[in-house]
């Protein structure tokens, strides 16, 4: 059995998957915030419960926000303070007497989608998250590409390309990002960026769901806004696709629930790609809230 943990600032979620990649059991507990020992205990107790329930010693994979293992072997995860700065993988491997694998939550999202029954035919899968921020992951032949510092797939911290500034205007604001840089694309393409763009052009502070509702009602202002957003997304994604050249792009995050994105994006991409490039298949993520657990469990699928 494959045990997948999706760990965040408020909850530890465990999903148990069989050899057919089907979810057999899941359980959630609160994430301890102040005690590393309590954090380790919470994970180990869930593993023990799963081992007993299924009569086996399952493999353990963990998805967690941040950098799973820095050069000194410690975790960097600002949203999980009890474990940040600790040698989490080594400590859990020792306590559980098995190989525990860690990766960041965006890679686990991408891995979950790459192992969808229909999507396994594609060698290179790119996950793109359009949510509170913009991120994602790359999966090649069923395994995540992490990079030296686990920042592969941090697409949101690419800067606006020159074509975007030409389209939006050279006086377009280069917003300061939480990473300390200016002009990172997640400030314009995330759910918050979607709302910011609307306010910037129309001086109305609406949230993304409100704007989308107006779009669905045929509101001309909202429709013009969505056209502008999709054009900007296509410009930025075109740069990424020129570097990565994936077979499949799977879009997740809150904005993936807006059908216009997956329905209209592909037609806008060719003008931003090399003439010989082929537009990849673009799909909405299929596994929702279970994706983090699925992807973490599947860290053990290919060795």
Swiss-Prot record:
ATP binds at residues 4-11, 133-140. Gene3D superfamilies: 3.30.420.40. GO terms for molecular function: ATP binding; N-acetylglucosamine kinase activity; zinc ion binding. HAMAP family: GlcNAc_kinase. Pfam families: ROK. Belongs to the ROK (NagC/XylR) family. NagK subfamily. One of its GO terms (biological process) is N-acetylglucosamine metabolic process. It comes from the Bacteria. Pathway: Cell wall biogenesis; peptidoglycan recycling. Zn(2+) binds at residues 157, 177, 179, 184. It catalyses: N-acetyl-D-glucosamine + ATP = N-acetyl-D-glucosamine 6-phosphate + ADP + H(+). It is an enzyme of class 2 (transferase). Keywords: ATP-binding, Carbohydrate metabolism, Kinase, Metal-binding, Nucleotide-binding, Transferase, Zinc. This is N-acetyl-D-glucosamine kinase. The lineage of its organism: Bacteria, Pseudomonadati, Pseudomonadota, Gammaproteobacteria, Enterobacterales. Catalyzes the phosphorylation of N-acetyl-D-glucosamine (GlcNAc) derived from cell-wall degradation, yielding GlcNAc-6-P. It comes from Escherichia coli O9:H4 (strain HS). Signal peptide: none annotated. Coiled coil: none annotated. Its EC number is 2.7.1.59. InterPro entries: ATPase_NBD, N-acetyl-D-glucosamine_kinase, ROK, ROK_cs.
